[in-house]
Amino acid sequence: MAVKRHYFKTQRRLGLELPGLGKSGALSRRPYPPGESGNKRKKYSDYALRLEEKQKLRLNYILTERQLRRFIRDSKTGQPANWVNSLASRLERRLDNVVFRLGFAPSIPAARQLVSHGHILVDGKKVDISSFVVKKDQEISLKDKALKNQTVLQGLQKPRLDLPDYLRKEDKDGKVVGIVQALPGLEHIPFPFDAGLFTEYYAARKA
């Protein structure tokens, strides 16, 4: 899947490459926001800085505002004292992200297509819901026909990120299987993220 042009503009606006969007290089030629020139970045207000942290999560994991708020509500219900870490864990364990992190796809949008087209198995059963949250010890694998898919081959040959330590790969009956061996947390978000600013953004808002 080609990286959409607006994904590059999004990353330039943030001054940060978001791995989930796929191909690197968004900042290599023009490391400044669209509409600006030179290397001086505009100074932002405290509110804008807090908003930016929220945008990083929403854009990297390709979520609508409504979807992100639902994940926040679920995280606050499960672990109210440490809900941001719980949120990070849930986002990292979304099926589309796990497929991407395993190197089965070169980006989260590409992984989402594999999931929605029924190419992904969880514990041997087809799951076609990208927002499905994978549990610890569950196995993720590809259907046989998916191994010939160009998106899969691209991801396997040149993964965007190294395999995180909460995942492992095994060869099972001649197939590559990914396993969630531990619960991820804030430290596994694959880009600089200020949890404090993010928390402040939602402190006065009802998710």
Where are these regions (language model features)?
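Ferredoxin-like alpha/beta domains used as RNA- or RNAP-binding modules
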Residues: 1-102, 129-207
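Mid-length scaffold segments of soluble, non-membrane domains
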Residues: 101-104, 108-120
